[in-house]
Curated annotation (Swiss-Prot):
Database matches in Gene3D superfamilies: Mur ligase, C-terminal domain (3.90.190.20), Mur-like, catalytic domain (3.40.1190.10), NAD(P)-binding Rossmann-like Domain (3.40.50.720)
Signal peptide positions on this chain: none
Protein name: UDP-N-acetylmuramoylalanine--D-glutamate ligase
Catalytic activity: UDP-N-acetyl-alpha-D-muramoyl-L-alanine + D-glutamate + ATP = UDP-N-acetyl-alpha-D-muramoyl-L-alanyl-D-glutamate + ADP + phosphate + H(+)
Family: Belongs to the MurCDEF family.
Lineage: Bacteria, Pseudomonadati, Pseudomonadota, Betaproteobacteria, Burkholderiales
Amino acid sequence: MNTTETSRAAAPLVLILGLGETGVAAARWCARQGSPLRVADTRAQPGGLAALQAALADATVEYRLGCGEQFPPDLLDGVAQIVLSPGLVPHESPTRELLEQARERNVEVVGEIELFARALAGLAESREYRPRVLAITGTNGKTTVTALTRQLIEAGGMSARAAGNISPAALAALIDALDQDDLPQVWVLELSSFQLETTRTLAPDAAVVLNVTQDHLDWHGDMQAYAQAKARILKPARLAIVNRDDPLTVAMVESLQALNVRSFGRDVPALVGDMGLELGQGVAWLTACESNDFDEPAPRRKKDAPPPTRAGGRMSRLMPVDALRIRGVHNALNALAAMQLARSLDLGWGPMLRTLRDYAGEPHRAELVRSIGDVDYINDSKGTNVGATVAALEGLGQQVVLIAGGQGKGQDFSPLVPVVRRHARAVVLIGVDGAAIGKVLEPTGVPCVAAADMREAVRRAAELAQPGDAVLLSPACASFDMFRNYPHRGEVFAAEVQELALDRGEVA
């Protein structure tokens, strides 16, 4: 193990456990507050180490790197607080043993988002800085909703920063805002279930759980623990927003009619503040349920009466779904969630709808690469779990040749069966768990073929597709068996699609 340190201090230490993006941000923030640090990582040369060492050259920091499969027994000596990286699985070695020791010693374990929440509380006291905070979590769609919400807020005339799981880390964004003297009026936070596990005092003005499907069970242990981690963000929120199509998110609130609850879904909204979709005369619309123009004053509540609930209202059509540049029903639902978050700030519809119309989406998320011979090639490499792929297949509205496979993370692939049967012309399988997906899909009768690499996958898919179809890369799996990460997988797919176009004489 590699151990180095700068000047020692006798004060209790903060242990930064894991030097990913959030660990680096937490280390910078704690050093900025004058805390002596001990930084530990299983890797000898974690990414960003040199930059961190340069940034903390004048701070009191002890580095414990290259810990490997076991953290040293004295790692907790003198430690008052552990800042745990979301990349470390708490029930696996060596993290499990260290956290057990921390509990025995009454050492507090927090995450970077908890430090961010405490930082905002401190700034409220020292600078009277009280921004609005919006929080987004869910299995799929978090980044799209976070990025879109920020744009809608800025279109409405308020300054906003997006941070958290979307990158940059929340504390890195806060440090930057402080250094530039440019603190925003609104923070829009994308929060993963990992981050929520170690967050206790964040109290958003509004929070949304977009959906909950199987993912990260290797980290949480089971589906119940995963859903509970997502639900943590709703209880302290002033306004809770849920997907009424998803029973797991609906169960996170006491009642969909509650005054502090809003919902979105595929159906027409019935309660004031809710949003949904309406199909009228062959056109799908984004809709909102708004108060009637001449509502009577609410009657005085009698003693022991049940709590007041939201009333019904009138439906307003906002814009046709086809006017969105982002593709698929799942992205229409993402747009509804983003608008509800922005509306919680009392922003008007006009600027939001103009921005929504122009929003082109985030990379590797149902992203149109190009069309070749009347076949659309769509990069949904961020579809790293079954739920994301189901949403992509259901949302596109056309027959699909699906490219799927990779590292399955122990998921149940059976939810793919009905949507593949309905929407897929064929499936091209890649990666270590491609064969496992193929076996699950056998009852569909949909042709499944294997490909050794992305080049072969794209060309096999092109052969199977018919005019009007889409070739969809939505793997339902992690990428690390064949690629550096999901962006790399998407980039390779896009490059192979462009090569295919050149081979077929299509340049534009």
